[in-house]
């Protein structure tokens, strides 16, 4: 079913060009109620290779002790966020997120263990997307 245990929700995310309307790279498992969800990203408007939701390929397989993350409510580049940010791997290497080409009418599904976010909209248009989750009943 769609929605968390409790109220069901579909979020409309609006990310303006070159603004801090995004979350930093993170995993949804940092919230207990999202651990067992399947994430869905559905583009509505302004989604392209410069504005799509970034995701780190294969990161859903990484052990948590292989990453460095902040506390909740980190301040990064002067912006306060509500989710702990994954800043790097423990070996000091940078995170190499990609922006999948998700076409209109398609949905990108991904694990709550996948590192995603950090997507400054580098395009010229506002990015609008639906974000929702499925839970096993």
Regions found by a protein language model. Give the residues of each.
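Double-stranded beta-helix
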Residues: 50-115
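Short Gly/Pro-enriched loop/turn and capping motifs at secondary-structure junctions
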Residues: 114-117, 135-137
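Residue-level detector of short, conserved catalytic/binding motifs and their immediate flanks
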Residues: 38, 106, 128
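Conserved double-stranded beta-helix
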Residues: 1-56
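Short proline/glycine-enriched turn/loop segments at secondary-structure junctions
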Residues: 119-123
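Residues immediately flanking
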Residues: 27, 44, 111-112, 132
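A short hydrophobic beta-strand segment most commonly corresponding to one strand
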Residues: 42, 124-137
């Amino acid at each position: 079913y769609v929605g968390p245990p409790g109220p069901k929700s579909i979020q409309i995310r609006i990310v303006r060009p070159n603004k801090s309307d995004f979350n930093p790279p993170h995993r949804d498992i940092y919230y207990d109620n999202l651990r067992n969800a399947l994430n869905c990203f559905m583009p509505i408007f302004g989604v392209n290779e410069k504005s799509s939701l970034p995701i780190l390929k294969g990161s859903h397989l990484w052990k948590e002790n292989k990453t460095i993350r902040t506390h909740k409510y980190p301040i990064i580049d002067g912006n306060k966020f509500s989710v702990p940010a994954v800043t790097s791997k423990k070996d000091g290497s940078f995170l190499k997120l990609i922006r999948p080409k998700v076409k209109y009418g398609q949905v990108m599904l991904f694990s709550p263990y996948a590192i995603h976010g950090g997507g400054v909209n580098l395009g010229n248009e506002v990015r609008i997307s639906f974000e929702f989750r499925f839970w096993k009943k």
